[in-house]
């Protein structure tokens, strides 16, 4: 089995068949004999996603990642599906099988791609619908006549039989036996080309997965989708096999290798929500070999508990609304009684009754709150529980470089220091630019989370690199910054180097970078970090211990119970009811 379209998708699925060593750009992944390939309708170009399941061609053309030659993806999609799901039979020093494929399948697959692409480009179909269409037309499971795949399989079997009968005489008996065994394995696999029911299940499973992917895209917020794609399981696998440089300049479709029948049974037994969660877990890197009946039941229980939690939250909110309504009615009733009685006596009695009513409401709230069973309160970094106790254990120590801490000062002082400093990047910036940048750089509260024991649940390590004579490390987290009426999705970037005397990491770069789903891959790549980093870090001890930093009045930190996200809130010191800014850092997706 070998790969013919290496410039676009690099993945080859290898089971019992040969993989040509001459295909230098191909990448092989071992596939369990019981597993099949599932293709997710997410197309990537290097680190960046260029096609979502919900994307129509008109959306694709407007995309910032629009390829100059989209036909290469669209018009080769059927070949991509064939190579990933079926594969090629090929033998070294024997081109009969290659010629047979070119004769019977190449033109057929090309026509499938062209027709599907025309419908996609001219019509109102989404990318996932186009992928489903390609599956249906390749495998022709509902065809009343002879299927092209079956005819090709019959011709292949004849060629394999011929090859077995004409083994080279110079081969030893041991070599012949080995070759005969391999050819029989190949023949057994090719015989499945006639098994319409097998391919019908594969098409059904693909449609099920495509639908789950659409629901994921429609149901998640932009920052949640960014968190999902940031993990990039297939990208990580490609980088491990190809290296960072080659993988970042290739195109590929996200896929997984899993027991198709198990997935279909899980969908029938547990429904679409569990299927969607299974797809999420595969996108996060869950291996198909680890997805069995026991694991599916575990996922189903997690989904049920999540639903119960949601129902409890809805019930709680309804009770709170009812209490508020009763409270309002009670106050209105008390006011009516006051008017009916004499002013002096009425005031005394009315106020007394109102207070008694409020007291009863308060007691009811406390009892119901204590009875509620919810998600345990999670303490992150400098956030505090209602008891007011500080976080204990597992906290890390960081130092802060002056180029980070200076953003806490007034815009005038920041400008003055940058103008007098050595970094050309910031010299001569206008006061207005400094004010704008302060919004994105004055986020030192992030260090409360970074030095907590939960930091790895939020931050991803994008790797180390050396620049300007110093080894540096970069971490990123997905977040949302709300300021001035705007809601901006992006990443929180943290750059560190080690203090040579103490070995303590020094934070020399800290900012929120606005980016969307399409540009997130670039932002998270080590190449981007190195290219946009300062050339040389001033290491003349221009930094202080993070623990010495005093947070200004009106800045609070908390973990949002419902989502597990970490929030930094900047309130107006003069009016704490007014929120000036809010930075929410997303927890990394949960791997079950």
From Swiss-Prot:
TM annotation in the entry: none
Disordered: annotated segments: 306-404
One Pfam family cited in the UniProt record for this chain: DUF3654
Biased composition range(s): Basic and acidic residues: 306-339, 353-362
Coiled coil (UniProt feature): none
Family label: Belongs to the UPF0329 family.
Protein name per Swiss-Prot or TrEMBL: UPF0329 protein ECU01_0110/ECU01_1500/ECU08_0040
């Amino acid at each position: 089995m070998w790969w013919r379209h290496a410039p676009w998708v690099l993945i080859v699925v290898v089971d019992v068949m040969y993989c040509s060593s001459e295909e230098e750009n191909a990448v092989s992944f071992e596939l369990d004999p019981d597993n099949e390939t599932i293709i997710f309708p997410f197309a990537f170009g290097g680190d960046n996603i260029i096609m979502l399941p919900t994307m129509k061609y008109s959306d694709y053309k407007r995309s910032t990642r629009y390829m100059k030659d989209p036909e290469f993806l669209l018009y080769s999609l059927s070949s991509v599906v064939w190579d990933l799901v079926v594969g090629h039979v090929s033998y070294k020093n024997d081109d009969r099988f290659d010629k047979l494929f070119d004769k019977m399948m190449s033109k057929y697959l090309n026509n499938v791609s062209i027709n599907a692409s025309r419908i996609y480009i001219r019509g109102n179909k989404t990318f996932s619908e186009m992928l489903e269409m390609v599956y249906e037309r390749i495998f022709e499971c509902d065809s009343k006549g002879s299927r092209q795949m079956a005819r090709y399989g019959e011709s292949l079997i004849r060629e394999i039989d011929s090859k077995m009968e004409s083994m080279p005489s110079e081969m030893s008996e041991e070599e012949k036996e080995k070759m005969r065994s391999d050819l029989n394995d190949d023949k057994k696999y090719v015989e499945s080309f006639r098994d319409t029911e097998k391919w019908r299940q594969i098409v059904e499973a693909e449609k099920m997965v495509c639908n789950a992917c659409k629901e994921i895209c429609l149901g998640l917020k932009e920052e949640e989708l960014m968190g999902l794609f940031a993990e990039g399981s297939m990208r990580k696998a490609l980088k491990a096999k190809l290296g960072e440089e080659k993988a970042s300049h290739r195109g590929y479709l996200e896929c997984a290798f899993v027991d198709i029948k198990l997935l279909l049974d899980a969908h029938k037994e547990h429904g679409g929500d569990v299927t969607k969660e299974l797809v999420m877990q595969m996108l996060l890197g869950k291996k198909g070999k680890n997805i069995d009946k026991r694991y599916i039941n575990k996922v189903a229980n997690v989904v049920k508990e999540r639903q119960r939690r949601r129902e409890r939250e809805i019930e709680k909110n309804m009770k709170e609304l009812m209490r508020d309504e009763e409270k309002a009615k009670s106050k209105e009733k008390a006011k009516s009684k006051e008017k009916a009685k004499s002013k002096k006596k009425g005031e005394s009695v009315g106020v007394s009754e109102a207070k008694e009513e409020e007291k009863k409401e308060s007691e009811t709230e406390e009892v119901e709150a204590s009875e509620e069973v919810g998600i345990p309160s999670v303490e992150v970094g400098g956030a505090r529980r209602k008891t007011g106790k500080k976080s204990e254990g597992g906290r890390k120590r960081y130092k802060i470089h002056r180029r980070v801490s200076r953003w806490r000062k007034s815009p005038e002082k920041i400008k003055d220091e940058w103008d007098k400093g050595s970094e050309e990047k910031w010299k001569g910036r206008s006061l207005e630019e400094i004010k704008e940048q302060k919004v994105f750089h004055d986020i030192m509260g992030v260090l409360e989370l970074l030095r907590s024991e939960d930091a790895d649940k939020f931050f991803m390590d994008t790797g180390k690199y050396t620049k300007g004579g110093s080894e540096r490390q970069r971490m990123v987290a997905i977040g949302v910054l709300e300021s001035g009426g705007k809601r901006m999705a992006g990443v929180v970037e943290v750059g560190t180097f080690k203090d040579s005397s103490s070995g303590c990491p020094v934070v020399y770069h800290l900012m929120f970078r606005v980016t969307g789903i399409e540009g997130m891959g670039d932002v998270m790549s080590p190449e981007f970090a190195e290219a946009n980093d300062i050339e040389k870090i001033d290491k003349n001890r221009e930094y202080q211990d993070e623990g010495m930093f005093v947070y200004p009045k009106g800045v609070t930190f908390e973990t949002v119970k419902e989502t597990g996200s970490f929030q930094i809130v900047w309130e107006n010191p003069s009016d704490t009811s007014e929120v000036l800014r809010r930075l929410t850092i997303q927890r990394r997706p949960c791997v079950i």
